[in-house]
Amino acid sequence: TTSATIAIEDSEVESDTKNSEDESNDDENSEEVEEIELGDKIVFGEYNGVSITWRVLKISPDKTEAMLVTDKIITMKAFDAADSDEYARHNGISYSSNDEEANANLELQAFIRGNSDWKDSDIRAWLNGEKELVDYGDSAPTKKKMSEHKNGYDIEPGFLSNFSKKEIEAIKPVRLETKANGLSDKEMVVTEDKVYLLTLEDLELFEKAGMNMLTKPTEECLEQDESKWYQDEQDGYGVEMHYWWLREPVLDSSSKCYAVGNEYWEEKIIENTVGLEGLGIRPAITVDLTSDVIFTKE
């Protein structure tokens, strides 16, 4: 009788344990499929050795896709490097930012200061680079081709090389239409990208998602940054937020793009020359929420 009683009790304990484990697994599964909402913080992929936190900007009506943008600036980089041997210098001639010839000659302007065309930009190549070596064509973004000869990224592995194969597969290629710059005879440039920068129109999504479009750099970004623009602005003006690039060009220029400002200046949107290496990068992606990847809320 005693043995039978013990066996029954052991069976009940095992049953209770199994039920407890099942409930625990159910809780874990419920967390995994927890519905993603606008403004949520999502952890996905990594860069600079740490996980990337993203914000949900947009969700498709059928809730199978979500547009994400990094919560903070993850790196400081020029949008595009000069094609000349050195920034603002060609054939032994130096061109200041106020140089009349360079400002009037759009081809020369793009050549010595960087080209604002998203399709052929260095930052597009880097963001979509899945390998250690990124193909920049005839001219790579070396330090010498940046405005202050800092933050070159010619030998830095492509952004997507930091992601697993499964994570890359979960990022959907998106057909993008971007306004053309002053050198083009077209109004729009069409590309297909997995990773991209936002446009002026995209900024409206922040308000719809209940989010502030102003942001600051990550600690890892500041450790990597050689320009120290953020620290200078912080020391000089006490700002916490920093500028970050959009992919939209200034139409009457070939070397300027729009960027989001910081909280110090009145203008929320600024124009800047694309060869300036002290502005931030906030990548955006569109992910497949039905993929095998678990998008974890922070």
Spans of model-derived segments:
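Ser/Thr/Gly/Pro-rich low-complexity, disordered linker/stalk segments of secreted
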Residues: 3-31
